[in-house]
Amino acid sequence: MEKQENVGHIVQIFGPVIDVQFPNEHMPAILSALEVKINDESIIFEVAQHLGEGIVRAIAMSMTYNLSKGLEVYDTGSQISVPVGKQVLSRMFNVLGQPIDGGKPLDSFIKNPIHAKAPTYLEQKATSEILVTGIKVIDLLIPFIKGGKIGLFGGAGVGKTVLVQELINNIASKHGGLSVFAGVGERSREGNDLYFEMKKAGVLDKTALVFGQMNEPPGARMRVALSALTMAEYFRDYENQDVLLFIDNIFRFTQAGSEVSTLLGRIPSTVGYQPTLSTEMGQLQERITSTIRGSITSVQAVYVPADDITDPAPATTFSHLDAKTVLDRGIAALGIYPAVDPLASSSRALEPNIVGKKHYLVAKKVVQILQRFKELQDIIAILGVDELSESDKQVVARARRIRNFLSQPFFVAQKFSGIQGQFIKIQDTVNNFDELLSGKYDNIPEEAFLYVGTIDQALEKAKKMGWSEKN
């Protein structure tokens, strides 16, 4: 006997949320996908609430311009599913897994639902292998763990997206594995730039891109990270791959959840965020993990509203991360990029039994000097450097050189800066900073350490500036 379609009718519309009347005995399950057909278009909704009397409330995954009350709504009987497997590589998708790159439609493919359970404790696997990024400040002070979760925190315009793109360039090209990029509520232009940069770098054939940009409704922005994660999970669990998952920007996931929560009639929690903030974040983050079959290493850009790191959105993300890289507007104002604040950043991998004793001691000494330099800032502002003790003068001079040497020219920014990008090996970074701490280069002008990769390049730059070893 042929299965009868479950059909309802729209009874109320408010923006991207609709109420649909179904027969009482055939209400669609929570998270089921609903479909509305208008002319040749199909709009997909996801069931969020059962209101009783056969009415369900659902969230749109695309624009709802042409909707009207009374339109028929079809229950698909399943969750939103996206294509997975080798066919998604080198392609660009929307939240529903539909290609948006103008390429040919996918041939036969497997589809997986975007909602899934996190791996159990028995399936998970702990690892302490360092992921080399080639970026000095990260490799030395905030080392990333393979299979870990990394957060890049910063306000507007401090360089989060550029840092994510540099990490994609450095890790994806050297790592050799597969990558999935989720563009969550960010600019369409950035997605376009990234697509062509990856194509140029030759890593597009190992990458899948999924976008729910800022012009799309909150339902799409809230679910696009799950669509990308579903693709990454398939590579981890069925292809036994080590996968890189880039999310830019995880704050927009929270922001979209807040918009939807208000439309669903929930009472807001702290600072206007949804009361389910911790639960939603946990459901996403707990799926991003390493298992006995493969690993997912996640790099997430996190916008910090009004530069307030204690805001509930970034604060909720903090608890899930292995490494926290904080970008600071004050450092960016000095013209030092990446504008990473070493004193606010941290990594659980910075332990002698993981990175080695020498690396650990050099990193701690660098942080100590920068901390002392920060403490002296008020005295310098009031009395000037001349009033400091000789030992403090030495700390200030050395800290300025260290601060400048933590800057680095990026490959993805060389068309703007005109400086060739640099990838620095961890051992070279540790040795260079060890020599800098020893006072060996105290006589080199501090400007020579800006935007160079190694000490040798700093010496070369100093000579071009008129410095000689006799000075």
UniProtKB/Swiss-Prot annotation:
Catalytic activity: ATP + H2O + 4 H(+)(in) = ADP + phosphate + 5 H(+)(out)
UniProt: ATP binding residues: 154-161
InterPro entries assigned to the protein according to its UniProt record, in alphabetical order: AAA+_ATPase, ATP-synt_VA_C, ATP_synth_F1_bsu, ATPase_a/bsu_AS, ATPase_alpha/beta_chains, ATPase_F1/V1/A1_a/bsu_N, ATPase_F1/V1/A1_a/bsu_N_sf, ATPase_F1/V1/A1_a/bsu_nucl-bd
E.C. no: 7.1.2.2
Localization per record: Cell membrane
UniProt-listed Pfam families: ATP-synt_ab, ATP-synt_ab_N, ATP-synt_VA_C
Superkingdom of the organism of origin: Bacteria
Coiled coil, from the record: none
Membrane topology, from the record: Peripheral membrane protein
GO MF assignments: ATP binding; ATP hydrolysis activity; proton-transporting ATP synthase activity, rotational mechanism
GO CC terms: plasma membrane; proton-transporting ATP synthase complex
Keyword Translocase: yes
Transmembrane segments annotated in the record for this chain: none
PROSITE patterns: ATPASE_ALPHA_BETA
Record keywords: ATP synthesis, ATP-binding, Cell membrane, CF(1), Hydrogen ion transport, Ion transport, Membrane, Nucleotide-binding, Translocase, Transport
Family: Belongs to the ATPase alpha/beta chains family.
Function summary: Produces ATP from ADP in the presence of a proton gradient across the membrane. The catalytic sites are hosted primarily by the beta subunits.
Subunit architecture: F-type ATPases have 2 components, CF(1) - the catalytic core - and CF(0) - the membrane proton channel. CF(1) has five subunits: alpha(3), beta(3), gamma(1), delta(1), epsilon(1). CF(0) has three main subunits: a(1), b(2) and c(9-12). The alpha and beta chains form an alternating ring which encloses part of the gamma chain. CF(1) is attached to CF(0) by a central stalk formed by the gamma and epsilon chains, while a peripheral stalk is formed by the delta and b chains.
Name of protein: ATP synthase subunit beta
Organism name: Mesomycoplasma hyopneumoniae (strain 7448) (Mycoplasma hyopneumoniae)
